[in-house]
């Protein structure tokens, strides 16, 4: 039986980082790829990701509009809360084996929180990185919510292990 891999794509940059992974996963005989586009990834003014994915031959299973206008801490918190609610409904319906999320934005932590509370394995890429911005705190929190850690450098892997994560999951 195929494993269900649900990937949440939140913006154009996240899509660009994992496009090749998505294309290969869509061809896999072992995986059933479920793509969810959310947040700014749905908006034309930020480069509508759905159009890019369709052009690349990928299916979009779910679309979520959750951006609360304002681009300030209050609206980011509200957008995060909306996305947790919407993703929880999708996760309940789809029953994925693994949820994959990218980077460190408020949408990423929403994915990690929803998956963790629903006892779904959460795979996170780009953990362990250090930037000095608020995103760093969010990224480290996402790491703690995640079950599988995909890093780009050995230095980042070591940092995740120093945070107390099991080395076999990094």
What residue spans do the PLM features occupy?
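Short N-terminal targeting/anchoring amphipathic segment
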Residues: 89-105
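Active-site-proximal region of nucleotide-activated glycan assembly enzymes
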Residues: 120-170
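N-terminal subdomain of nucleotide-sugar transferases
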Residues: 1-41
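Conserved nucleotide-sugar phosphate-binding/catalytic loop shared by glycosyltransferases and other
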Residues: 33-79, 86
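Structural motif
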Residues: 8, 36, 101-103, 125
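An aromatic- and histidine-rich active-site surface loop
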Residues: 100-117
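Helix N-cap/beta->alpha junction signal
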Residues: 11, 104, 152-154
């Amino acid at each position: 039986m195929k494993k269900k891999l649900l990937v949440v794509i939140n913006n154009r940059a996240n899509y660009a980082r994992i496009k090749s992974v998505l294309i290969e996963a869509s061809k896999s005989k072992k995986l059933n790829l479920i793509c969810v586009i959310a947040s700014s990834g749905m908006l034309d003014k930020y480069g509508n990701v759905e159009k890019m994915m369709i052009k690349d031959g990928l299916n979009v299973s779910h679309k979520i509009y959750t951006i609360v206008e304002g681009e300030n801490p209050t609206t980011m918190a509200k957008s995060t809360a909306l996305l947790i609610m919407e993703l929880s409904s999708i996760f309940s319906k789809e029953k994925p084996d693994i949820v994959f999320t990218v980077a460190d934005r408020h949408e990423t932590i929403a994915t990690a929180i929803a998956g963790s509370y629903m006892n779904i394995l959460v795979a996170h890429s780009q953990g362990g990185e250090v930037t000095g911005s608020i995103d760093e705190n969010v990224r480290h929190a996402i790491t703690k919510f995640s079950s599988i850690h995909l890093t780009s450098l050995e230095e980042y892997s070591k940092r995740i292990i120093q945070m107390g994560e099991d080395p076999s999951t990094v």
